[in-house]
Amino acid sequence: MTESWIHPSAVLLLGAVILPLLPRAVRRVFIVLVPVLAFGAVLLMQGHNGVYGVVPFMNWELTFGRVDALSLVFAYIMTLMCLIGSIYGLHVEEAAQHSAAWIYVAGSLGVIFCGDYLTLFLFWEMMAFSSVFLVWFRRRKQSLASGYRYLLVHTAGGLLLLAGLVLRYKATGDLNFGPIGVADPQLYTYLIMAGFILNAAVPPLHAWLPDAYGEATVTGAVFMCAFTTKTAVYVLARSFAGMEILVPLGVCMALYGVVYAVLENDARRLLAYHIISQVGYMVAAVGIGTPLAINGACAHAFAHILYKGLLFMGCGSVLHMTGVSKFTELGGLYKKMPKTFVFTLVGGLSISAFPLFSGFVTKAMIVAAGFEAHNYWAGFLLTLASAGTFLHTGLKVPYFIWFGKNNCSQKTWERAGDPPLNMQVAMAVAAFLCIFIGCYTPYLYDMLPFPDVAAQYHPYSAAHISETLQILLFTALGFFLLLKKLTPEPTISLDLDWFYRMGGRLFYWFARKPVQSVDNAVGEAWNRQGIVPLMRTARFWSWFDWHGIDTVVDGTARGVRALGGVLRLVQSGSLQINIISMAAVVALVLTLLAFV
């Protein structure tokens, strides 16, 4: 297995590079083939746990392939969802959209299989910088702005993560990605956790999610709803299992997302808010940290990727066919889009934890783990959040899109109809899996990190079925009694991002007005009181240098130069030559006188 081990990210990255180079005639086959190969690479790893793809780098070892039960369950569903999403997007002609989606998935899978923090950070940033194009490819002004905010937030999260990793390496000298000492947390522990929970969309670090997912392309939103937050759940489960602070954070997410989903008028933004709620269950489960809770987090992530992807595909189909996604502009579409209605209904029943659907066998595992760990308050509040889930996603979405008052314009009504065949096939596959998992639990339970614990959990007990049906039926009764109050309105719900958006404007005003005014005043005062005296002083010293110091120096230099000329004459030998010549003449005269 070591020699034949293939990283699914390598398959997707290679496919992303090759796809734009292929002729259009073969692209559709290739778009399906690449995810199939990536899914096959994960299937080949089943039963072959171990460490693969270790690469020496400077003084470290980069581990690209840590294969165990925890990584495999996430890799399995992520590659499967990549295949479903690629089929859903077959009608998209722009190759760059498919390439961006595959690079995004490759980043997620790289994080799933990594064994060290350096590799994790590499793939973590790959996720952020590739997924933003799934927002920008919609090519609207709002999408460009939303993508820019998305990138800024994730860049900040990446910096927090990097700071934590650097501090951890300095303190421990270890880059291995594994459990962090939650019993004795250090500063780097909280920095790393902050980087992770930002991707999990934990309030108040959550506003990027509905902002970006609501503005993404139809196919891009299907990919985005499946990978970023679930990758964050994986890294939290790997490194922060049992971190108690995650329990209240997760419960807060579950309730917060439900409230804002009820208020939302846009279908895809509603689903985005509900991602926050459902991921809250997983975060709380990681905080509980028991084997049953970790199983619940993994199982719910598995199911959530499928049914949330199905819901985004259904609402995306409505947007694709009609150009509209607001409830106040839709209604009565079950006649025009009957197949899409059925698929979306399956997703709504799954997310509402209706018996025989996937959410029923996964969500309750987390609630049961909470009660088992004596976190009764968490168990009760998560049960309350389940009622809210059925209220907005199980009832509000189907009612105001498919039934209810027909608010469609004539153009919207004429354009409405079931989407292209590839989109229907993708929704059908996801819908089938939602039902299959709910009816045959061993398919999912046997993949979980603690299969023995999962085998002892029985979701179809009389008490659980009775409790669930009571919650669902009373929620439905409340929905229809309060239907007028729950009717969507064409308004915008203010979220916590208002504070940093307004804070940004306040900072901009503060920089332009008070700070700039003070800077101008100080500058003018300096010009009057500082620059003028300084220039006068400079001119004086320039004059003194020119007429004083330079005169002395130049005069001295001229004297030295003259003396040097004299000394040079002596040193050169001219005087000696004259003396010798005179001596020679005298000697010659004396000789002549002697012989004459």
Please describe what each predicted stretch is:
Residues 84-95, 99, 105-120, 130-415, ...:
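Hydrophobic transmembrane alpha-helices and their helix-loop junctions in integral membrane proteins
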Residues 350-365, 431-452, 528-529:
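Alpha-helical transmembrane segments and their membrane-interface junctions
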Residues 50-65, 172-182, 237-239, 363-370, ...:
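Membrane-interface helix termini and inter-helical loops of multi-pass transporters
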Residues 6, 13-17, 440-486:
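A generic transmembrane alpha-helix motif of multi-pass inner-membrane proteins
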Residues 444-466, 486-596:
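Aromatic-capped, Gly/Pro-kinked transmembrane alpha-helices
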Residues 24-35, 145-155, 336-343, 417-431, ...:
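Alpha-helical transmembrane segments and their helix-start/interface "positive-inside/aromatic belt" motifs
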Residues 1-99, 173-182, 505:
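Transmembrane helix-loop-helix hairpins at membrane boundaries of multipass inner-membrane proteins
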Residues 58-74, 181-189, 369-381, 457-464:
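Short aromatic-rich membrane-water interface segments that cap or initiate transmembrane helices
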